Structures are given as structure tokens and as C-alpha cells.
Amino acid sequence: MNGAEVIVDTLREQGVQVVFGLPGVHNLALWEALSRSDIRLVGVRHEQAAAYAADGYARATGRLGVAITTTGPGAANTLGAVGEAWASRSPILVIATDIATTLRRPGVYRGVLHETVGQQDLFRPVTKAVFVVDAMHELRATVGAAATAAAAAPRRPTYLQVPTDLLAATFEAQRQSVARVAEPVGAGEHAQHVAVLAAARRPLLWVGGGAIDA
């Protein structure tokens, strides 16, 4: 199993059914892994559209919205849409690639294709949390943490950054116990709540801000 397959497998475990994105030379391994899975992959023509689509999907379904993009300018193109998701408390996960670990030099710009110094720092003002993978053994747990963080209250975007060489690298994958995204409440449960309220003589509702997305 390679790194891209680990990401896709973990997204499936988290209940992800749809992913939006734009392919690029750095993230092709992820696209190939998605094409072999049962996750629906929706291609767009601009990275911002991927993030907006993930936002809209999250609002319409209550599920985690996922957008994938490539390194540097591709990732930066999502910022406007991620900012909107932040303001609207939408649970979306942006997965972007980074230059290979073998090409990283702290504090040094090497001019590698699409290299952006501190790429993850672009997302800190508009996300709930930023996750950066530095080694293969961290991958499954970090993907799971990024997904569950976005979906946990208060729901907001998270950002996950994965070096390109880890997408193609293979290793002996081991199952790890990770927290999972909660499923949206079904219509049957809503009906039970309505029945309880209808039978109450003096019902009192204490409603938090999250009710707007319920």
C-alpha cells in the first residue's frame, strides 16, 4: 500500500463519499488511488471551485466535505473559499501536496516546482487546525485527526499537507485505531425528537449556534 492509498483508505473509514479536486503533477498518485476506490471523485477547473464545492456539499449533506489540490499556487487558490467555509462554520478538509521531503531545507528556498515557503502558514488564519505529515508512519493517524477535527464542534475547515514523495512511497500498512467522523443524524431520530416535543406539556428548547446546520 502506498501513501496515496493510505489517505484514501482512511477517508473511506471516516465515511467520506465524495471528493472534489484538480489534478496536478504532484498529486496524481492520489487521483489514481481515488479512481480505484468507491469514493466519487469530482474534477473541477479551478482549485477555488473544489473548496467551494466541498463547502456546499458539507452544508447540504451534513457530511465532511473534502477538497484536494496540488502544491503552492494550487493550494493558495483555495484560500478565498476556505475563508468562506471558516466564516460559515462548514466542516471541510483541504488536502494539499508539498515538495518532497528530500528537497526540504528549513529556511531555504530552492526553487523546486511550485515550492512555497511556509505553505501551511497560509491556512492558519482560515482553518481550525493545520496538519503536516513528515513521515509515512504518521500518515493514517494524521489524516484521521484532520478529518475528525473538522467535523467536531465547533465545525470548521482543517488543512492537511502531504509531501509528494510520501504519496508514492510504499510501506507495510498497519491498521491504527483513530477517531471517526460522526454520521449525520438520520430522519428517524429527528422523528423521535419531534414526538417527544409534541407530547410535552411545557417544552423548553435550549438551542446552540450549531442548530442552524442541523
Regions inferred by a protein language model and the residue ranges of each:
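N-terminal alpha/beta PP-like core and its mobile active-site loop of ThDP/TPP-dependent enzymes
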Residues: 1-214
